[in-house]
């Protein structure tokens, strides 16, 4: 999925599927973002693929909610894919995502997220749990040298 803030597209977020499908400038921008995201996700050229799916998000009308417009990928879904709702809800409980930035700060423990779509609402329970953290430190070079390996190693 490629989450995009409605405001970054000059949208309110509550546009109807018909309004979005008629907005060729927004559709072209979403497609450009989708193609770039496909490359950055390691999916290669996604021109002829349905993945990744673009999703427009904006603040919900109540606490713990997010407004979502899900694309398949070149037209707005009339309601919302369930798998897409799970992705939007997951993004809204993870720190630092576009959905979180829309005012849905992550909370400890299980949290219900209401994904508001053109045909209604989907309630998804989500929880952020850090399973692992890793890093590679590249601050400075600590070794440079040459290793000489004998042509034949002694038998043991």
Residue ranges and their predicted role:
Residues 1-156:
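Active-site proximal loop and beta-alpha junction motif in alpha/beta enzyme cores
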